[in-house]
Amino acid sequence: MVTGIKKTVKVVVVGDGAVGKTSLLILYTTKAFPKDYVPTVFDNFNCLEMYDNKPVNLVLWDTAGQEDYDNLRPLSYPQTDVFIICYSVVKRDSLDNIKYKWLPEINQTNQGTPIILVGTKTDLREDKKTLSQLQESKQEPVSRDEGVALAKEIGAVQFFECSALTGNGVNDIFAAAIKAAFNKPAVTSPTSKSSGKSSPSSTSSKPSKTTTTTTTSSSSSSPPAASTAKPAGEKKLSWGLFRKKDKDEKKPAK
């Protein structure tokens, strides 16, 4: 039996452009892989989930990774419960930028907010064309061990690898994000000691299940809003927040 008041959990997804952030979110919310790559400015997605037998309004924010939006992007950061930082396992620069761009940007306004590190496009590790292109530039795919090491270095609460094309690992990411939002340390009083890094709570006595509703509906464009409540049982997808289509950058997603 479902009990309790619905809690809103805001998750913001960041990372370099074209690393697969939008594909990850679309696959999770619609169970369909997008055919075309269209650069994002901002989109948000609302999903009704269950955590520990309680309803959760999961609000997912998709952001632009391009430098053109460096001043606009942080406007989506207030009241964020969890950040998901993505990099492509076949784009080493996107891994390096986590330390030099994304983590510093987040810490300017949201230091201490739980972070989940995600390596995307794992299916391309076995793609001959991709491997050939990497070899030409004397590079190789980012290994899982490198991702694990970076997650520890930046204090991420979880690390995942996934493929939006195959669906491998996708659901686990968002289940972990909800858990991290519920288990993040409460705001301490001035007399309490505060830690420099956020980590999973150790007070949870047992793991909780996160379930996903599957009914979807669409809505028209509206200003960014992260806390719109919807009836139980509904899974809503909000589209069109400043979505930009750049013909020069349009290409098949991986």
Curated annotation (Swiss-Prot):
Residues 186-231 have a biased composition (Low complexity). Residues 186-254 are annotated as: Disordered. InterPro entries: P-loop_NTPase (IPR027417), Small_GTP-bd (IPR005225), Small_GTPase (IPR001806), Small_GTPase_Rho (IPR003578). One of its GO terms (biological process) is cortical cytoskeleton organization. A motif (Effector region) lies at residues 37-45. GTP binds at residues 15-22, 62-66, 120-123. Residues 232-254 have a biased composition (Basic and acidic residues). Pfam families: Ras (PF00071). One of its GO terms (cellular component) is cell projection. Gene3D superfamilies: P-loop containing nucleotide triphosphate hydrolases. The keyword Cytoplasm does not apply. Keywords: GTP-binding, Nucleotide-binding. GO terms for molecular function: GTP binding; GTPase activity; protein kinase binding. Belongs to the small GTPase superfamily. Rho family. This is Rho-related protein racD. It comes from Dictyostelium discoideum (Social amoeba).
